[in-house]
Amino acid sequence: GGGLPLLKASRILLLILMLCVCFHNKKIHLIRQPLKVTGLYWPLFIYFAARILANGYYAPSLSVAINTEFTVIVEQLLLIVMICQVVRSREDVHLCVKTIVNASGVVAIISIINVLIGSNLFYNLNTVSRNVLMVSTVRMGIIRAEATFGHPVYYAMYCALIIPLALYVWQNEKNAWNSCVLGLNVIAAFLTESRGTIVVLLALFLIYVIIADKKTRNRILTAVCAIACVAVVVSFVVPTVAQQFSNIIKSVMIAFGDSSETIENFGGNSSTGLSSRMIQLSGISWMLIHNAVFGLGASCHTRGKLSYRINGVWQVRDTIDNGYVGYFVEEGLLGGIACFSLFYSLLKSSWKKATFKNSRNMNNSFFLCFVSYVAVMLSVADVSQLLWVIIALYITYNAKAQAIASE
């Protein structure tokens, strides 16, 4: 089941991008050298070869495997190639990042409004007859921010990727709008109530404050003090808002602690612990038993093919909440190798190129994006298309740096 791939707005934009490249550039430039400069040539080769092979195994009998092949080839591989054709300089990379960040501010504003009015305005944009993910989860009495992503955790993943980029723009272009965009994305991420993402962002914030240059550190601490003052004032003026934020923080502490305490009117999944994510690791054992090399196939959890070991008994479950488990159970060892090959190389490469004492080095934000994504994947089963845009921009940014250095 699953049918043909949906004609989504992102796919229409990709089609437009392809047409622009064909008519403007007249030819496709090879990106082998830029990939080698960043050390991503072989990791990306392994990633795409392994995933295409794993899904190709099921393609003759499983339409969702064809959909996944389409996503991997067109929305990941082809997307990187197309962006590297269009974005030809560091100035172009900066403009792309600024545009992405500015757009995220608009999305964050509407998402926060959705929380305030208790309804998702983005649902009015749904024009397809097929069922699409629109969760509209209510937790602790308020709707969770989710924007157009269908689920709060997916929007939280988007915020986790956007915030490091917004931080870069805020550092290098000091104006009120950039400060607002950064703040809006932080608030939106908090209002998703995705506890794993909130903890990751808090950890990254603390690390960044420690390793950043003195000037940046002072600016951040000043901003934090200002936000704290506003929060105190709001808590006195509107006690219900203060209680809501307090409950979110409390739910995060309970989720990552050993407390058996619960939150009244929590809603959705359990407010106590993240044991379900740990239990899902047993799905890898189930995969190894049944098809170690190719896995159980795309969307195995919705087809009743996936089981987790719960209280010593294998039980069929229809959810995957851990991104790494998703790679393994759906695509076997091939998918697992593809995943870890790519993520390890992204972290290693970007860490080598980052210089946190120089705030103008965009590799700092790229590194934080990759760390954020890798960490959030522990609690979110999502392959964000924004990640591939960031990877393409990272490749172009450093390829141009190498070209400038060699002149």
Predicted segment positions?
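A membrane-periplasm/extracellular boundary helix in multi-pass inner-membrane enzymes
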Residues: 109, 115-118, 192, 212-267, ...
